[in-house]
Regions:
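Flexible, membrane-associating and regulatory peripheral segments of lipid-active enzymes
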Residues: 1-53, 76, 109, 156
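Serine-dependent carboxylesterase/thioesterase catalytic core
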Residues: 53-64, 68, 74-183
């Protein structure tokens, strides 16, 4: 799908979320505290059956930001694993090859396709990496990630601009990858 086809399908109305939505992220520490208190009330059925789930944190976050999710998935019988990149610095061109390597390695270890769970930019990376190694991915779960497009349509676009990262270049490569549709469920 090229840019013209993308705009024909989705229009020009896609843009960054409002700043007020980004400010909602400030509630994260309070939400984490509520989760810690309510932890024992969460469902605990063994539904994962040892399936591997690769966790990808959002922009500006490290693997430790996914600790609650990892513990919960493990308690459900999944084998949740952190990505090897550590801190998500937002440089998609550098992170994407590492995510692809992680997917291949964990899929090979599991001898089966794995699931990907990405938060924000981590969800974008999960989605785009899955295009490259579809045979290694059984499902993609995203939390607060754009379903179409890339960082250009997120609240962190301004941070990309400040850091001098070219969101148009990232967007153009995303549109080029649309030529290869994702076949696993998202």
């Amino acid at each position: 799908m090229n840019k013209a086809e993308f705009q024909k399908r989705y229009g020009n109305s896609i843009g960054q979320p409002k700043l007020s939505l980004l400010l909602g992220e400030a509630k994260t520490p309070f939400e984490a505290a509520k989760l810690a208190v309510g932890w024992r009330f969460l469902a605990r059925k063994n539904v994962g059956q040892g399936q591997t789930v690769l966790l990808l944190p959002g922009f500006g976050a490290s693997s430790s930001s996914m600790t609650f999710i990892k513990r919960y998935l493990n308690s459900l019988g999944y084998k949740a694993v952190h990505w090897s990149a550590g801190f998500n610095h937002g440089e998609v061109g550098k992170l994407l090859p590492q995510v692809i390597t992680d997917i291949k390695e964990h899929s090979e270890q599991a001898q089966a396709p794995i699931k990907l769970l990405g938060w924000s930019l981590g969800g974008y990376l999960a989605r785009e990496a899955a295009r490259e190694v579809q045979q290694n991915v059984s499902r993609i779960v995203t939390i607060g990630s754009p379903v179409i497009g890339g960082p250009k349509y997120t609240a962190v676009k301004t941070l990309y601009d400040i850091r001098g990262l070219d969101v148009e270049s990232i967007e153009n490569s995303t549109l080029k990858r649309f030529e290869h549709p994702i076949v696993c469920p998202i």
